[in-house]
Amino acid sequence: MLRIADKTFDSHLFTGTGKFASSQLMVEAIRASGSQLVTLAMKRVDLRQHNDAILEPLIAAGVTLLPNTSGAKTAEEAIFAAHLAREALGTNWLKLEIHPDARWLLPDPIETLKAAETLVQQGFVVLPYCGADPVLCKRLEEVGCAAVMPLGAPIGSNQGLETRAMLEIIIQQATVPVVVDAGIGVPSHAAQALEMGADAVLVNTAIAVADDPVNMAKAFRLAVEAGLLAPQSGPGSRSYFAHATSPLTGFLEASV
């Protein structure tokens, strides 16, 4: 069970809604993933009506929506988008994204911290997408963010946990949930993140662009379950030397 702010989730896999070939395929994949929290870019939906091609099936699926501010380049733009989302969707939950460079989509740490502090004061439950910077993540936690979402690698790159060393520090020092976001390309990456101690992962591109998004979503669901179960089971310690799993000489001595 994962608790963030006032909500609890059985699934530790969060999913996105971008890049799917159709809304129907998107919903089928989300259901197959078991995800209960789904991000939604405000720039991609018509907030004036709930029969939007993306929004309507998500509402029907009964998932918790996490609107994001993707496309915002400044704190001011992100705050504006946040208020639009709250008014249209009736939720205080927000994934805060501010990335001024469209080529790399790396989060702006200064603008993110600035926006996060303001939005928390305005009553939002803020989950900021940020770089894998332990100092920044601690600052975001201190201003009241409900979780932190450090990147594993650039958005959509499928590179995996390129920031592993920094993620380990973030996880070790955090007192709020850590959700590894961006760069997760295959299910094993998700399992590794959970084995490291992350509380959840957010996956979009790896599922949406797969040849079979529904089966890939299932694979991620199973990987996340494995990643959670493994550390709970007390894995053996690593050793420099080999250790036999069965006696090496007993059968020889018995035959003499």
UniProtKB/Swiss-Prot annotation:
Name of the gene: thiG
GO molecular function: thiazole synthase activity
Subcellular location: Cytoplasm
Catalytic reaction equation(s): [ThiS sulfur-carrier protein]-C-terminal-Gly-aminoethanethioate + 2-iminoacetate + 1-deoxy-D-xylulose 5-phosphate = [ThiS sulfur-carrier protein]-C-terminal Gly-Gly + 2-[(2R,5Z)-2-carboxy-4-methylthiazol-5(2H)-ylidene]ethyl phosphate + 2 H2O + H(+)
Entry GO terms, CC: cytoplasm
GO BP terms, alphabetized: thiamine diphosphate biosynthetic process
Family per similarity comment: Belongs to the ThiG family.
Pathway of action: Cofactor biosynthesis; thiamine diphosphate biosynthesis
Main location (coarse class): cytoplasm
Quaternary structure, from the entry: Homotetramer. Forms heterodimers with either ThiH or ThiS.
Binding site for 1-deoxy-D-xylulose 5-phosphate: G156, A182, G183, N204, T205
Enzyme Commission number(s) of this protein: 2.8.1.10
Keywords: Cytoplasm, Schiff base, Thiamine biosynthesis, Transferase
Function: Catalyzes the rearrangement of 1-deoxy-D-xylulose 5-phosphate (DXP) to produce the thiazole phosphate moiety of thiamine. Sulfur is provided by the thiocarboxylate moiety of the carrier protein ThiS. In vitro, sulfur can be provided by H(2)S.
EC primary class: transferase
Highest taxon in the source lineage: Bacteria
Protein name per Swiss-Prot or TrEMBL: Thiazole synthase
SUPFAM superfamilies, per database record: ThiG-like
Record bears the keyword Zinc: no
Entry annotation: catalytic residues: K95
Pfam families, per database record: ThiG
